């Protein structure tokens, strides 16, 4: 347990930051889930729109230090590829 005033303050700050980061991660996961659901339905236009709204949220997660930049780059790339495949006509 924190004993000095400084360590008590640091513990309070860490707790507050953890709560903010948890909310940010939850928000990002919600946007990702919307993209996944749109892809699952097979509607390319809805999936593209969902991806377009999710990309800035993912980028913001990197800026705020919630997610690693390579993790976000990988997620964006994979989702964009899946949306692209969905929007292409089926090869006969």
UniProtKB/Swiss-Prot annotation:
Disulfide bridge positions per record: none
Region described as Disordered: spans on this chain: 1-22
Pfam families the UniProt entry points to: Ribosomal_S20p (PF01649)
One Gene Ontology CC term in the entry: small ribosomal subunit
Alphabetized UniProt keyword annotations: Ribonucleoprotein, Ribosomal protein, RNA-binding, rRNA-binding
GO BP term, example: translation
GO molecular function ontology, one term from the record: structural constituent of ribosome
The keyword Glycosyltransferase is assigned to this record: no
Function: Binds directly to 16S ribosomal RNA.
Family: Belongs to the bacterial ribosomal protein bS20 family.
HAMAP family: Ribosomal_bS20 (MF_00500)
Protein name, as recorded: Small ribosomal subunit protein bS20
Taxonomic source organism: Cereibacter sphaeroides (strain ATCC 17023 / DSM 158 / JCM 6121 / CCUG 31486 / LMG 2827 / NBRC 12203 / NCIMB 8253 / ATH 2.4.1.)
């Amino acid at each position: 347990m924190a004993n000095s005033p400084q360590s008590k303050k640091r513990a309070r700050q860490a707790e507050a930051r953890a709560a903010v980061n948890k909310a940010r991660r939850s928000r990002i996961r919600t946007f990702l889930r919307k993209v996944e659901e749109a892809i699952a339905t097979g509607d390319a236009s809805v999936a593209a729109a969902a991806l377009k709204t999710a990309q800035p949220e993912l980028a913001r997660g990197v800026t705020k230090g919630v997610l690693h930049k390579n993790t976000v780059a990988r997620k964006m790339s994979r989702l964009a590829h899946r949306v692209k495949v969905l929007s292409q006509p089926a090869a006969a």
